[in-house]
Amino acid sequence: MTKQTIAILGPGSWGTALGQVLNDNGHTVRIWGNVPEQIDEINKEHTNKRYFKDVILDENIKGYKDLSEALDGVDAVLFVVPTKVTRLVAKQVAQALKHKVVVMHASKGLEPDSHKRLSEVLEEEIPAELRSEIVVVSGPSHAEETIVRDLTLISAASKDLETASYVQNLFSNHYFRLYTNNDVIGVETAGALKNIIAVGAGALHGLGYGDNAKAAIIARGLTEITRLGVAMGANPLTYSGLSGVGDLIVTGTSVHSRNWRAGDQLGRGEKLEDVERNMGMVIEGISTTKAAYELAQELGVYMPITQAIYKVIYQGAGIEDAIKEIMTGEFRHENEWH
C-alpha cells in the first residue's frame, strides 16, 4: 500500500495506540485533540502520559489543535472520540472537509439520546459526497497491549467490502491484523453492548464471586447481546467472532478494561460518581446501559442482565438485590430468543 495520511480524532489511549500502528506501517499520522496541553506534550515530549506513562511515541506522530489543519489533504479520518460527542465532532468535520475521504470510527457505544449506532450518526452528519461508506474498526483490543506491539486481531466492518479491505491493508502488520466484515450492525452492537456486561462482571469480582459466576455472566451476557443485535438486523454469526465473544472476553475479564474496573469498584461499595471521578476516563458502559435498556424495551427483547445493571446504576437498586432477581426469576430454556 502506498503511504497514506490519516487524521485521528481523539488523543485518548486507543486513538494514540492506533496512531502508532499506522505510523509503524509508514503512514503519516495526525492526532487532533481539544486539550492544548496534551497536543503540546505529543509534539514536544513525544508522550501521552495520561494514558501511557512509559511509552515514547515516534517523532513522526504529530498532534494538531486546529481541526481544519489536521484534515487538510488527508486520505482517511478515524473517529476515536467519546460516544456522546461523536455527533458534535462529525458536524465540525463536515464543515472543515474540502475533499472526499475514507471515514472510520473505533469508538464503542450507542448515542445516548437517539440510541443510534455511531456509523448512523456519521452518515447523518457527514455528506455522502465527502466520505466513503463508514468503516467500523472494532474487536478485542486493549490499548495498553497494542501500544507495546502485543498481538492484536480485530475487525474492519463496512457495507462496502472494498473500503473495508482498504482499512484492512492500512492497519495490518506483523502484530496487528484485521479481518473484513460486512455486518456493520453486528460489529457495532457487539462492541457497544459488551461494555455493559463488563461492568457487571467487574461488579461480581468486587463482591467476591468466583469464576463460575464470571463465566455465567459472560455466557448469558453474550446471549442477550446477540438477542438485541439480531432484533436490530445483525447477523448472529458475528457475535461468535472477534468483535463479539472476543471483545466480550477481553473486556469482561481484564483489569485493563475501564468498564470492568468501574464495575469492580461498584461491587466494592463505591458510589458511581466517585468511580467516574477516580477513573478519569469515559466509562462507555454506563451510558450504553441506559441506551440498551431503552432499546430492549422498545423492541421487546429480553435482557435481564442489562436490566439489572440499569436498575443498579439508574434506579439505585442494590447489586445483591439485582443478582437475586436474576437468580430467582422465571425458569427459561437456555436458547430462547425472546
Swiss-Prot record:
It is found in: Cytoplasm. Its main location: cytoplasm. Pfam families: NAD_Gly3P_dh_C, NAD_Gly3P_dh_N. It catalyses: sn-glycerol 3-phosphate + NAD(+) = dihydroxyacetone phosphate + NADH + H(+); sn-glycerol 3-phosphate + NADP(+) = dihydroxyacetone phosphate + NADPH + H(+). Gene3D superfamilies: N-(1-d-carboxylethyl)-l-norvaline Dehydrogenase, domain 2, NAD(P)-binding Rossmann-like Domain. Pathway: Membrane lipid metabolism; glycerophospholipid metabolism. The active site is at 194 (proton acceptor). Keywords: Cytoplasm, Lipid biosynthesis, Lipid metabolism, NAD, NADP, Nucleotide-binding, Oxidoreductase, Phospholipid biosynthesis, Phospholipid metabolism. Transmembrane segments: none annotated. NADPH binds at residues 13-14, 108, 143, 258, 282, 284. Disulfide bonds: none annotated. Sn-glycerol 3-phosphate binds at residues 108, 139, 141, 194, 247, 257-259. One of its GO terms (biological process) is carbohydrate metabolic process. Its EC number is 1.1.1.94. Catalyzes the reduction of the glycolytic intermediate dihydroxyacetone phosphate (DHAP) to sn-glycerol 3-phosphate (G3P), the key precursor for phospholipid synthesis. NCBIfam families: PRK00094.1-2, PRK00094.1-3, PRK00094.1-4. Belongs to the NAD-dependent glycerol-3-phosphate dehydrogenase family. This is Glycerol-3-phosphate dehydrogenase [NAD(P)+]. The gene is gpsA.
